[in-house]
Amino acid sequence: MARIMIVDDAAFMRMMIKENLKKTGFSDFVEAGNGEEAVSLFVKTRPDLVLLDITMPVKDGLTALQEIRESDPEARIVMCSAMGQESMVIEAVRLGALDFIVKPFKPERLVQTVRNVLE
């Protein structure tokens, strides 16, 4: 089963994502609360997929995306953004994100995106 890293500064959002993915059979998770933790944990744990929030303290999602892709150009990363962050989403795709999910999102959209990227 795939290892999924969930990166969001909001603990409730990490929990919600994890619970929705658990319901569909995913069980191996790594969590980070900011971009700096995400980069460090990515190098240590090499997850199959990273769900990465854009707006976070310490190190934002775009910077973390760049650093993760520098350490592993094949890293599979999906950005999570709030409404109104379209320019950041475009930049994230330019930097190598494979997809994005706009918050708030339906659980079905989350699961389908994760499955599509992992195929």
Describe each model-derived feature in a short phrase:
Residues 34-37, 60-63:
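Acidic catalytic/metal-coordinating carboxylates
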Residues 26-33, 41:
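Short hydrophobic/Thr-rich beta-strand motif most characteristic of the beta2 strand and flanking loop
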Residues 56:
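Receiver (REC) domain active-site loop signature in two-component systems and cognate sites
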Residues 45-51:
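Active-site beta3 strand of CheY-like receiver
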Residues 15-23, 90, 108:
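Charged docking surfaces used in two-component/phosphorelay signaling
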Residues 87, 105-114:
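C-terminal output helix
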